[in-house]
């Protein structure tokens, strides 16, 4: 298939519809693969000296999960990422895992991943005209800052209060 400017929009629509029309088993498998991609991207870390929470590339995978898989399966991919990370796969940032990560300084960000993935999937599914680059970049920006950063800061503030009394 040769993609050029003339057939770009029809190709974009075709790919999106193909994912949405896939079988349930295929969508669950894609959710698991997106959870794995999130775990891999979590290993790209930029530590910040003023906070215990580093910047990671996993946010990109989180936002793409809602974009590619839609609200239900994008959200499922992030729930799988969290559940498997808490249960036995050390794939959170810095190859960490376990319940202490979810209940620690990064727990609010992990909860925000589920919310952001659902929101982006909802917008992508509900508003077909939002599937262009400029509109989706705005939606992703809102989801990144409002739906990941705000719950993350709330979780970090709670963690500081409970551990340091600040």
Question: Which stretches of residues belong to each language-model region?
Answer:
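Interfacial aromatic-anchored transmembrane helix boundaries in multi-pass membrane proteins
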Residues: 43-54, 82-116
